[in-house]
Amino acid sequence: MKVASVIGLRPRISGLLFLTLGVIALITILVPNSDSSSTTSTTRVPPSNIYSNYGRVKEQAAVDYLDLRFFSLGVNRLKEFPLCGKERDNYVPCYNVTESDRNCEFAREEERCLVRPPRDYKIPLRWPVGRDIIWTGNVKITKDQFLSSGTMTKRLMLLEENQITFHSDDGLIFDGVKDYAFQIAEMIGLGSDTEFPQAGIRTVLDIGCGFGSFGAHLVSLNVMPICIAEYETSGSQVQLALERGLPAMIGNFFSKQLPYPALSFDMVHCAQCGITWDIKDAMLLLEVDRVLKPGGYFVLTSPTSKAQGNSPDTKKTSISTRVDELSKKICWSLSGQQDETFLWQKTADPNCYSSRSQASIPVCKDDDSVPYYHPLVPCISGTKSKRWIPIQNRSRASGTSLSELEIHGIKPEEFDEDIQVWRSALKNYWSLLTPLIFSDHPKRPGDEDPVPPFYMIRNAMDMNARYGNLNQALLNQGKSVWVMNVVPVKARNTLPIILDRGFTGALHDWCEPFPTYPRTYDMLHANELLTHLSSERCSLMDLFLEMDRILRPEGWVVLSDKLGVIEMARTLAARVRWEARVIDIQDGSDQRLLVCQKPLLKK
């Protein structure tokens, strides 16, 4: 690879070129959109310079239009963004304390500035130490909030004045999280919680994850959890989980669907999550059923019954009677109960729904839409899906089988080629994550140079994940990294295969902010996302501000795209004050890499 720095804008565009690009842009705007543009994902393989179809011509014209619009604004683009005020240290767009639902309309009117870290912010400790010890200045939570609950003091210990230590065997849930997980395993019929993967449990949606102790234990069992909790101005469960290096994102389903397809998770877990399941015509429970795979489990734990008596019959009446009634209408069965924990299993037989009484909840007639914050539906989803495969029947072999690829409509040769591309690319990417490439005399790190620390990155995001093969490449190389695999809503919806592979991810519209707190990711990666977004007329300036918001200080950005778009991105990287270097892949294409690192900025 050739390392090259882009240090300025292009020469002034000639009048003829200006006119030509203007005509191309006008044609692009006037020609109706092709249906295929909203369903075809961007390719990982560098495209040919000769475009043989309308979709490619339209895409290139959109890039040319964006390029023209960008450079016609001149040197004003080079001005650095100011730092936001202290009041926005933990700013999350699209959310406020008065509305439970996500609303991004007012976020577009906010001042454009860089969200700075708090005054006492420190770089997080590397994994796995950072799982158990975090800096108090990195999260918006006070010691009083920790110590105000008697149960919390069992699992937390404050070290000196600036650290919080999470006990590895804590008192989060009754006798400890390990005992709690073992209890769930017993109700399923397993000998130990270590058998979760063998029982088909690879992915868990954890609703209201507390401080992430259950999720941390699942990670140790090679189970992938994802925590969701509503937005909180202080003491956020999501912020704490991410600070510990555990998968999490802001989310609730009070009135809208979660950004996951039907049949996404092997288990849904709710421990003291505060949800009243029998309101809104049971649509909250129906949303759990929608994202739960056939044969999957719903675990509900609540200690509220203690005040109403200690007998098993009293507990069952106070907690599960109404949920039991609803569960029968959606073909769930109560599989076990121990103490305050109840476990239901979703049917593995799709014929169950046709054998119910007429008074039962109906089956959805059409549930093939992309579930991006759509309103909740009063019907049962996913029953006609090709992905209706009970978790107990799923192949235990490593890798993705030909039959699974066929279900998802993916050609095996295309999938295998994508795997090889990312195996090779990751070797190059990882070696580039060093300040050496930003020196006055940049070079590719050699054998004599120190390699990047093995545990340098924990929280990673692939902003245009396609099949999730960057995630797979990281696992193959033994990196202790989890990846938030994001699939753009207007690209081909490949999130189902990502989740079916045991990874985590979400659908997202990159014209909007991502539902997370500031400084929560160590690395952001995107392949051809900028070209994809240019066809959507999204603001790349706002995208870079959002990337800066969610990226940790000293975190990394790796972008792969066409040369023209990468040049624009390099200029925007300077505006958000990142160190940046453009790298020539030297494969004969116009593809380039942009490698950036965010500095620790403070006022």
Curated annotation (Swiss-Prot):
Looking up CDD domains in the UniProt record yields: AdoMet_MTases
The GO molecular function terms of this record are:
methyltransferase activity
Intervals, Cytoplasmic compartment: 1-12
Segments on the Lumenal side according to the record's topology features: 34-603
Q: InterPro entries of this UniProt entry?
A: Put_SAM_MeTrfase, SAM-dependent_MTases_sf
EC numbers listed for it are 2.1.1.-
Mostly located where? endoplasmic reticulum
Which sites does the entry annotate for glycosylation? N96, N393
Kindly list the residue ranges recorded as spanning the membrane: 13-33
The listed locations are: Endoplasmic reticulum membrane
Biological process terms from the Gene Ontology for this record are:
methylation
Note one Pfam family from the annotation.
Methyltransf_29
EC class (word) = transferase
| The keyword Transmembrane helix is assigned to this record | yes
Gene Ontology terms: cellular component = endoplasmic reticulum membrane; plant-type vacuole
Q: Which UniProt keywords apply?
A: Endoplasmic reticulum, Glycoprotein, Membrane, Methyltransferase, Signal-anchor, Transferase, Transmembrane, Transmembrane helix
Q: How does it sit in the membrane?
A: Single-pass type II membrane protein
PANTHER family in the cross-refs: METHYLTRANSFERASE PMT4-RELATED (PTHR10108:SF1083), SAM-DEPENDENT METHYLTRANSFERASE (PTHR10108)
Please give the family membership noted in the entry.
Belongs to the methyltransferase superfamily.
Q: Which protein, by its recorded name, is this?
A: Probable methyltransferase PMT4
